[in-house]
Amino acid sequence: MKVLAAVAAGLAAHAFVNARLLRVPTETTATAQVSVLLPLRDEAARVEPCLRALLAQTGVDLELVVLDDGSTDGTGDLVRALVDGDPRVRVLRGRPLPAGWLGKPHACQQLVDAAAPTSEVLVFVDADVVLAPHAVAATVALLDAMQTDLLSPYPRQAAPGATVLVQPLLQWSWLTFLPLRLAERSRHASLSAANGQLMAVRRTAYDRAGGHAAVKGEVVEDVALLRALKRTGSTGGVCDGTALATTRMYDSWDELVDGYGKSLWTLPLPTLAVLALLYVVPPVAALRGSRAGLLGYAAGVAGRVVSARRTGGPVLASAAHPVSVALLCLLAGRSRLQHARGALSWKGRSL
């Protein structure tokens, strides 16, 4: 138990160092020509704030290309009404999904194919993301300043209700386990973190890696794309997007269970075992009177507090960190079972 507590304490210290080193985009202008790419499938209920924020971007020369990927809820008509003939915007109809492709990579590849050939940077945005007016310019400017090929500013994650137990684990995971400054310069694919909610990619690097065609069957296509870039000599990583973007991925616990279910089966079993050993076993031991277990629990909570304070997350939820990790492991187990049964789907498409 003392070893587990010591490792958890070391990881909390690592998260603290990462939090201090995490790059922060600043409000500025960008000189590159940019294509902002927005894939949509049945997003009529949430796309309006995202779209209005994109149309209000400042400090950057951009075009906005929107793909309606077979929506059945009027998404395309709503988008056309909202853009109201804005010359910066093109709205496309998605083509049928080819064999061997998943929906998100196919939509993104179509968007890139339709982007202006003069665009130097591709910025992918999800429909549940609302950007600050300077977000695109600040992202592209930092991409250039870092002389890197992919930059993913991690948005602030709004987490209502019970989703607060799991959603903050996104930022906590890479702050805790990934050496960020090393990862952003390393070409080792294993040192990769990215988030397709907001992601800027240098077009030359994207093309060299094979684009989304190189990750056409990947459920976690954002991280897979960065790994493909690294395998072809590029670099990239994450930065703090708290002041640039906010996203609310799920409105309820049931939505979160379905959403996480489509991808958590990809987590290796050894990873889940390590998480349980480090963050679930010590607090259980603490309840049985173990001082080392109590220290291990405190270390886990400390790491979560560091992450929450750095990324605008809920600090009080950090106290329930063992519950959060246990729930993550259960969700991963459910996802694995559904994947084995061939029962996973997302927005009407099998995964």
Residue map of PLM features:
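Acidic donor-binding/catalytic loop of UDP-sugar-dependent glycosyltransferases
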Residues: 74, 125-142
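A conserved acidic beta->alpha catalytic loop
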Residues: 68-78, 95-96
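Short aromatic/hydrophobic "clamp" motif used to bind/position activated sugar donors
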Residues: 108, 122
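Cell-envelope/extracellular polymer assembly enzymes that use nucleotide-activated donors
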Residues: 32-35, 63
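N-terminal membrane-anchoring/stem segments of glycan-assembly enzymes
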Residues: 1-30, 168-171, 176-180, 321, ...
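Short, acidic, metal-binding catalytic loop of nucleotide-sugar glycosyltransferases
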Residues: 52-61
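Catalytic donor/gating beta->alpha subdomain of glycosyltransferases that bind UDP-sugars
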Residues: 143-146, 150-174, 204-207, 212-271, ...
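Membrane-embedded multi-pass helical conduit in multi-pass membrane proteins
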Residues: 273-343
